[in-house]
Amino acid sequence: MTAILGHNFIGGARSAAGTLFLQSLDAASGEALPYRFVQATPEEVDAAAEAAASAYPHYRQLPASRRAEFLDTIAAELDALDDDFVAIVCRETALPATRIQGERSRTSGQLRLFAEVLRRGDFHGARIDRARPERKPLPRV
């Protein structure tokens, strides 16, 4: 598994301006685990919101096929998380590995489902009413 730095990602770059740290704990024992995460500062939160707002117009212009690719890529990355990830989450939550693996699969499955909706265009809500000349009392044309 990749080294856990505990930094925030803002606009595609790491940021760790905060001075407060959140310590990862073993849920069963309360023992500190070797992972600390920098708590974002109010300025970092603002910067993250601004970065998201400025990325939105570009993302909105992407064709549905590219958005579907994006969701499929996230799903693949989630599925690629190995047993080390599952073990850490089990310690932090006191949940069994099967639950964590199930949640991971459910999440990646939902991302793939939404990707398929994008590919099919279901979100447009388009309906095609075929002509029915035999329809009574009036034909649909």
Describe the residue ranges of each PLM region:
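N-terminal Rossmann-like NAD(P)+-binding subdomain of aldehyde/semialdehyde dehydrogenases
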Residues: 1-137
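Donor nucleotide-activated moiety binding/catalytic core segment of transferases
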Residues: 139-141
